[in-house]
Amino acid sequence: MASSETQPRFGQSVKGLLSDKVTSCSGDVIALTRQVLKGSRSQELLSQAARNMVIQEDAILHSEDSLRKMSIITTHLQYQQEAIQKNVEHSKNLQDQLRHLMK
């Protein structure tokens, strides 16, 4: 009878250990799933960051091109300003000459 009493206890302890192991494995599977999802999310974030970086690079290149064009326009405006100033001085000289002739 002693052996029949130990058998149910042994069977129960094996079932208990098995149940504990299943619970532990389930927890590990859940943790692994969370890590995989985190990794997947990290990959998505990295991909989005790379796309944003490309967009920013295009914007920077466009801005650089615009600045180059504005620099050229500024140079042309300076030439025009100098030409206008020379013409104003020349017209003042002509006005002085006309006044002198009218006297």
Curated annotation (Swiss-Prot):
Subcellular location: Lysosome membrane
Cited InterPro entries: BORCS7 (IPR032143)
Domain of life from the UniProt record: Eukaryota
Primary subcellular site in the record, as a coarse category: membrane
Key words, A-Z: Lysosome, Membrane
Disulphide connectivity of cysteines: none
Pfam families per the UniProt record, alphabetical: BORCS7 (PF16088)
GO CC annotation terms, alphabetical: BORC complex; lysosomal membrane
Function, in words: As part of a BORC-like complex may play a role in lysosomes movement and localization at the cell periphery. Associated with the cytosolic face of lysosomes, this complex may couple lysosomes to microtubule plus-end-directed kinesin motor.
Annotated family: Belongs to the BORCS7 family.
PANTHER family linked: BLOC-1-RELATED COMPLEX SUBUNIT 7, BLOC-1-RELATED COMPLEX SUBUNIT 7 BORSC7
Protein's recorded name: BLOC-1-related complex subunit 7
The species this protein was found in: Danio rerio
